[in-house]
């Protein structure tokens, strides 16, 4: 379990990148949901935390590949492989990421 930041410090519609062995991006959607995925686009090495968030979709800033934050699945080309998703919890106002195992997509 990795502490990220206080919930109040991550506004809706924003994201934050955390440095782990493989960087992780945490997103706070306009609907108030929290999602975490590997931060690197599976098409090319672009940071998804720098992409455009719309609903539960994140668009890669490099070639406009799009991923569903809930599943990690790509929703359009050029990406063909999913990004790994991670479980997110909030404890005492602090966002935590529970890293998924190397195999599979969800923690």
Predicted regions: what they are:
Residues 55-61, 74-83:
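Short cysteine/histidine-rich metal-coordination sites, predominantly Zn2+-binding motifs
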Residues 1-55, 68-69, 82-107:
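N-terminal pre-ligand scaffold of iron-sulfur
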Residues 41, 60-63:
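Short cysteine clusters
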